[in-house]
Regions:
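Divalent metal-dependent phosphate-bond-processing catalytic cores, especially two-metal-ion Mg2+/Mn2+ enzymes
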Residues: 1-80, 102-130, 141, 186-322, ...
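Residue-level detector of extended alpha-helical repeat arrays and alpha-solenoid scaffolds
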Residues: 333, 371-372, 429, 433, ...
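Buried hydrophobic core positions in alpha-solenoid tandem helical repeats
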Residues: 319-321, 358-360, 400, 409-417, ...
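Nucleotidyltransferase catalytic core that binds NTPs
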Residues: 715, 719, 725, 729-971
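Active-site flanking loop/helix segments enriched in acidic
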Residues: 82-109, 144-156, 323
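His-Asp-centered metal-binding catalytic motifs of divalent-metal-dependent phosphohydrolases/nucleases
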Residues: 112-116, 129-172, 178-188, 205
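Residue-level signature of the C-terminal ends
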Residues: 342-350, 380-388, 438-450, 462, ...
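Short inter-helical turns and helix N-cap capping residues of alpha-solenoid HEAT/ARM repeat scaffolds
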Residues: 328-329, 366-368, 406, 421-425, ...
Length: 971
């Protein structure tokens, strides 16, 4: 018999069987047979106990049923988990532990499993894609790692048990259950997007905590509400400072949002009932600001859950990639890229490799912007490819999570980009090569600081080879400026210098232009380097600068930056003073045969001539740049032209600015979309240099345009204008009210996009609001708050919740997510949203067949008196044959989409103004606010409802807003 008794001996014996590394527990192999006999007997009696006693949430496990198992793709893994759970006698182990240890592991694990399954089963009833076997296995296994901690690791159990849980799951081939079980820390909520199973487990674990000890010193397990549990944990956290408390409050807010989302679905979270308790959904038009914020949160969480469900399943992820490959519309491709950019950090290694292959293929895409976006994302994905073990590791443990690391992948893709397959045509080779610098920049910006040098080394190896063909040499030269020279030692820099010096002798204009551009950019940092100056002299001696004005200009700039004497001052003087040079540049830049590097240098020369005070035809230069922006085949030339044009804008007179703006606007209207899509990025900035009068005319022209093809690019333009609108007041001081009214006008134009009848325009509106406004840093937090206040309720009304295609769903998910990030950040910083809402409601009923400009002006006038106006559309008219109700409602939607505080009254709540019961219901819909009736004077004079005897809640008891109408008699 063991000296400490059988139970402690069996307890240690079982733990050592589960975790053989527990050498701090004495070996007890001699008890194998006794343990097997005892455990089988114990299992028999515990089974009988379960049959006779009612279910206990701190003792029993309600595992997934056969029906639930049949719906899961993880059926095999879950059955394997149940077998492992049984073979290891884990339940019996926890029951023995309850008898001999002060802590009660069983009560905690069973409690977490109970809450998790209680919630998960209800969510499934609401249509949320929760995998019940997956969450059941993860909840039952989430703390098994506590048995793996050695005696000397007891103090670190809260931090180390995640590793040992993951270890047990990996040993038993439970990868999906293990991934969720081992990542249930509240700090895992700092990841922006998690699967619903992970959220449920973290939520359940958060609520089941120690609630003290009984008189025998045994742990009492408590089931807390979310708020109570937060207070308990905050009191227990070690080394709590303000930063850590804020960090904890941030993750708690994520759980709170998730709980509120579940409550909105009718999920019972207080464990009193398994039946759903649906909460009636109010129409978005009737929500106050707090309810609107909650609605945004719930929609974003719902979309995230559904998208993460698709991305976390191998089969559905493959379907998404296949759909992305097969699309022919570049905007659809952009939507897929946006989803991958937002969610790729949650992909597993295999999914990342599949996505990277797709991105590589996209670098052959005919649209330059798609190639650039794919290259940026490829670099970012390589930088974040390695799975980092985020939890604390035991001493002397080194985890190898994948056979392939990011450095091996980087070498592979470097080779595929620089030396593509021989079957790739020349044009695609060049497109692919031009992407290299984007990949390098993105990789070095997103990787860890200490890893940057390691990523640069494989790239430098290509510069040691001097036998490249011309096109490969040009690609490497074009990429060289993206290598941070500060990372390199002298020998590595000399490799780059020698590479440029060697290829300068090639009689290829674009190679020589690339070399001189590189030297020009490097010159300020290396004026003291003898090797660099030697390279400069060697290159300038070889390059025939006299024959090409662009090269001569760069040679002049290099000598000036390096402090070298100018050899041919007359030639350089000619570059800056001869008007014929400008004419030649205008001609060369519009020729297809001119290398794109030369075009970029020419634009730089034109701008430098203007800045140096040389008399120049500025308007001619500006229109030339606008032409390049509209028609250049090379995307880099378009962007260079646009950037130069915006820099030139302050130097133009007001009439010249207006002329250029009109020219660019025509480009929006008459150009094919594949060309005009580049204009908004720069037109939106440029028009903010127009005089207020001309700017208002520009906005009005875009608003009144009937050209369908302009709709999407107009939205993009308005988005860019909003990004930079904060600078306008300093350029043209005007009354604050005028400035704000114009901002609202621009925001209203974007809202109109949500009401457009074309699906692609609606998607573009969502893209502009989500990606261009809320996701970017152009706007301050206060500006975003004002934007949210203007857009939010209308967005909820106009964005159709029935997403008819997967692509629309992806687009909406990204948009809602960007707004949700802002909401979370703002509430964390400011605690809550505060907006001043009108306290008076104007109820404006009518047939509105048609809805005229007169109706719209009346609604505006009432709104400006301090009302929120609700247009109540009659289902039909007794007096005339009206258009179908849905047609009239659609027209109303489009007509008032851009108007602040003018909404459509919910069609599912008809109000008969002659019925006091309906009018009572109307008052109750706006608690704390005064409801006014809006009517024409002829209606008040003739309508039967005004001839009835007054009674409580009749129309005569409502205050009115009456607009005068002339009768046929002229009164």
């Amino acid at each position: 018999k063991p000296k400490d008794g059988w139970l402690p001996a069996l307890y240690g014996h079982m733990i050592r069987k589960i975790y053989p590394h527990r050498d701090d527990i004495p070996a007890t192999d001699q008890y194998d047979k006794a343990a097997a006999f005892y455990l089988e007997c114990l299992r028999f009696f515990l089974k009988k106990e379960k049959e006779r006693l009612p279910f206990s949430r701190i003792r029993d496990f309600d595992f997934a049923t056969e029906e639930e198992l049949a719906e899961s793709p993880y059926e095999e893994e879950y059955r394997r988990f149940l077998q492992c759970f049984s073979d290891a006698y884990l339940y019996e182990l926890m029951r023995i532990g309850r008898e001999i240890m002060p802590f009660d592991m069983l009560a905690h694990v069973a409690g977490v499993h109970h809450i998790a399954m209680h919630i998960a089963r209800q969510l499934v009833k609401t249509g949320i894609p929760v995998d019940l076997p997956l969450i059941s296995g993860a909840a039952a296994a989430h703390d098994i790692g506590k048995y793996g901690c050695r005696e000397n690791e007891v103090r670190r159990i809260p931090y180390l048990h995640y590793y040992y849980t993951d270890l047990w799951c990996r040993v038993h081939e439970l990868p999906n259950i293990g991934h969720i079980a081992a990542n249930h820390s509240t700090w895992d909520l700092e990841l922006e997007n998690l699967t619903v199973e992970s959220l449920i487990l973290i939520y359940a674990d958060f609520r089941v905590k120690n609630n003290g000890y009984d008189e025998k010193g045994k742990e009492i397990m408590g089931f807390y509400s979310l708020a109570s549990s937060f207070a308990v944990i905050l009191n227990k956290l070690d080394n709590v400072d303000t930063a850590k408390e804020n960090r904890y409050r941030h993750v708690y807010s994520r759980l709170e949002d998730f709980e509120n989302y579940m409550k909105a679905l009718g999920v019972n979270v207080d464990l009193t009932s398994c039946a759903l308790q649906p909460i009636p959904q109010r129409n978005p038009a009737l929500l106050n600001i707090d309810e609107t914020v909650d609605a945004f949160k719930n929609i974003a969480i719902d979309h995230n859950i559904r998208l993460m469900h698709k991305l976390s399943r191998e089969l559905t992820f493959g379907d998404i990639l296949e759909a992305a490959r097969s699309t022919r519309n570049w905007k659809d491709t952009r939507a897929y890229l946006n989803i991958f950019a937002e969610y790729f950090t949650y992909m597993n290694q295999r999914q990342k490799q599949m996505a990277m292959n797709f991105l590589y293929d996209l670098m052959f895409h005919r649209e330059g912007d798609i190639r650039r976006q794919a290259a940026d994302l490829l670099g970012n994905m390589i930088a974040h490819y390695d799975v980092e073990y985020g939890k604390e590791l035991p001493q002397n443990v080194n985890v190898i999570l994948d056979e392939t690391d990011s450095f091996q992948l980087w070498k592979r893709y470097l080779d595929r980009i620089i030396l593509p397959d021989h079957k790739v045509i020349d044009r695609h080779r060049r497109w692919l090569g031009y992407c290299l610098k984007r990949v390098v920049i993105s990789l070095l910006e997103n990787c860890k600081e200490e890893q940057r040098k390691r990523y640069v080394v494989p790239l430098l190896a290509y510069y040691q080879e001097l036998g490249w063909i011309d096109e490969t040499a040009f690609i490497l030269l074009d990429t060289m400026p993206s290598i941070p020279m500060a990372l390199l030692d002298d020998a590595e820099r000399n490799v780059c210098f020698r590479f440029m010096e060697h290829f300068a002798s090639r009689d290829v204009l674009e190679i020589q232009a690339a070399i001189l551009l590189n030297l020009c950019e490097m010159a300020p940092a290396f004026t003291e380097s003898k090797e660099f100056l030697h390279t400069v002299n060697g290159v300038l001696d070889v390059v025939p600068a006299k024959e090409e004005k662009a090269l001569a200009y760069l040679a002049y700039e290099i000598r000036k930056n390096c402090g070298l004497p100018q050899k041919n001052k007359a030639a350089y003087q000619e570059i800056f003073e001869d008007s014929a040079v400008v004419s030649d540049i205008f001609l060369d830049n519009l020729k297809a045969a001119t290398p794109w590097k030369i075009k970029i240098i020419n634009m730089r020369l034109l701008y430098d001539r203007i800045c140096s005070g040389v008399t120049m035809p500025k308007l001619h230069v500006a229109t030339h740049l606008s032409n390049l922006l509209k028609v250049s085949e090379q995307v880099s030339v378009r962007h260079a032209a646009g950037e130069t044009l915006v820099k030139l804008a302050p130097m133009l007179s007001w009439d010249q600015r207006n002329e250029v703006a009109i020219e660019l606007t025509k480009g929006l209207e008459i150009g094919e979309f594949e060309f005009s899509k580049y204009i908004p990025q720069y037109l939106g900035e440029f028009v903010l240099f127009l005089h207020p009068k001309e700017l208002d005319e520009f906005i009005k022209d875009l608003e009144n345009s009937t050209n369908d093809r302009i709709a999407s690019v107009a939205l993009d333009t308005f988005g860019v204008m909003l990004q930079h609108y904060g600078q306008y007041q300093s350029r043209f001081p005007e009354l604050a009210q005028v400035y704000e009214d114009r901002r609202k006008k621009i925001m209203g134009m974007i809202l109109k996009g949500f009401a457009n009848y074309q699906e692609n325009v609606k998607r573009e509106a969502f893209w502009v609001v989500g990606h261009e406004l809320f996701a970017q840093d152009y706007l301050s937090m206060q500006e975003k708050k004002n934007l949210f206040g203007f857009l939010s309720k209308k967005m909820l009304m106009l964005v159709e919740q029935d997403e008819d295609s997967e692509l629309t769903f992806f687009n909406h998910t990204a948009g809602w997510n960007f707004v949700y990030h802002f909401i979370s950040a703002y509430i964390f910083q400011e605690k809550k949203f505060t907006f001043s809402e009108p306290q008076k409601i104007a109820f404006f009923p009518g047939t509105f067949d048609p809805f005229t400009l007169g109706h719209k002006e009346i609604a505006r006038e009432i709104r400006d008196l301090g009302f929120t106006v609700y247009l109540a559309l009659d289902e039909f008219s007794w007096s005339k044959k009206a258009q179908p109700h849905r047609v009239r409602r659609r027209i109303l939607d489009m007509s008032v989409a851009n108007e602040e505080n003018i909404f459509l009254f919910p069609s599912d709540t008809p109000i008969n103004i002659a019925n006091p019961a309906d009018l009572k219901k109307l008052r109750e819909m706006f608690p704390g606010k005064e409801v006014y009736m809006v009517a024409g004077s002829d209606v008040v004079q003739n309508a039967s409802s005004y001839r009835m005897e007054p009674e409580e809640n009749s129309i005569m008891t409502f205050p009115h807003v009456i607009f005068l109408r002339e009768t046929r008699e002229g009164r």
